[in-house]
């Protein structure tokens, strides 16, 4: 590249970023309209051409951009043979629970040939979020970024970056993911690992037939860049790093944090993280790498990293790419180190006087096979059927909209008896019952727990070792929560240390392998909200429950009527 080309590219990069900011930087709230056509395309990856489900024929899907307090209206048209819904991960949906998106929880799926219009405000929210399908495992390819910028008069609480880029970390399967989920359910065994990791849909040169399938960012030397990281994967937690560059975390799950600088980060599925990177190295090409964090034992997983390029403008074509170094796949210390560094930017109002205490165990189960065909043997441990649970209750997905049943006071579809503590107390991590499949059974049910509006809630999530303990990404719809503590082993109220001054405010928490995590939040959003593990396989197996927040005394504290075009089951 000639020296005269460098300033031209410099000006172009800055101009594009400025136009993007100007486009959303108007004064006052706006209404932003989008149309999502859910449709299949033929896509070639890893030496094979397969049919995948996309939005607007894009993989990854289109970006949604808005400004704090804007209204977003998205008409979703389902042009595929599969049912679908869209969830707006991290958007609280204040008084708009009907548009949250999880299938059979807040709505019936959008059936083939049908449409549904989502309509909600991003009230008092800004930052990096994610939209994705919330039916079966379709979010393997149906996902994209949802970026909410601060109001025009509100600056970032850090130095304004020269430019920004969105980095979507994904998993790619060559098989049809809807059929794959069905096969896993029928077999009772574990799922196969993804065929590749991807960065913005590209696997990079470590995979077959992928030497040219490499995402690349053009970087101006000595400038500061904001990278919006999103883990859109469905069954894997992942590390991310850039060769020879330091990453400064400034936001997680749409909430500002105190700046924390590290060499690598780990994101659980559904988590978002904004990082600042300074282009302070010698002009050249540097690897951005994504690789697995797998804390469970005896689990098959994809262990080939995805690679993208962080390329300085002015680098020569024959420059050797500087390789990035990822942690080993089970580096629990690297994960804890990053988590220890997360603090809310300012002092926060953590609930002190708690109205409801919950203790929820999370883990895997092995149920008896109970195959209808005696010749078909289940492929779980000791020929059992793998399951998952919260407080040993394995969630059974209904075939109606639970929110609609709750609103219309229909009986027989769910119960209000989800236990606030496990039935039995034992050494959850080390002494779990493991006589498969006699004492690893889970009870089945579609159960919820009810909170009064404004209740102050504390939940202890306790990892269990019934089969294997691992880092579980637990996501709460409709609310964010303060992560006030976490640790290894069994939770002990006498020794647990809580941060009540500046804990991070998240919507998805990785409950540590062989450990526990404590959260607090105020139940101030009326409706019915899903709590679940964000590994799709664990949600498929039943690691979910539901929180019902009752109406308050005022109209603005109450769930509105359902929309007229709400899909039918």
From Swiss-Prot:
One of its GO terms (biological process) is lignin catabolic process. Its main location: secreted. Its cofactor is Cu cation. Pfam families: Cu-oxidase, Cu-oxidase_2, Cu-oxidase_3. Cu cation 1 binds at residues 87, 475. It catalyses: 4 hydroquinone + O2 = 4 benzosemiquinone + 2 H2O. Residues 37-153, 163-315, 417-553 form the Plastocyanin-like domain. Predominantly expressed in the inflorescence stem, but not in siliques. GO terms for cellular component: apoplast. Cu cation 3 binds at residues 134, 477, 532. The keyword Repeat applies. Binds 4 Cu cations per monomer. InterPro entries: Cu-oxidase-like_N, Cu-oxidase_2nd, Cu-oxidase_C, Cu-oxidase_fam, Cu_oxidase_CS, Cu_oxidase_Cu_BS, Cupredoxin, CuRO_1_LCC. Residues 1-29 form the signal peptide. One of its GO terms (molecular function) is hydroquinone:oxygen oxidoreductase activity. Cu cation 2 binds at residues 89, 132, 534. It is an enzyme of class 1 (oxidoreductase). Its EC number is 1.10.3.2. It is found in: Secreted, Extracellular space, Apoplast. NCBIfam families: laccase. Lignin degradation and detoxification of lignin-derived products. Belongs to the multicopper oxidase family. This is Laccase-6. It comes from Arabidopsis thaliana. The gene is LAC6.
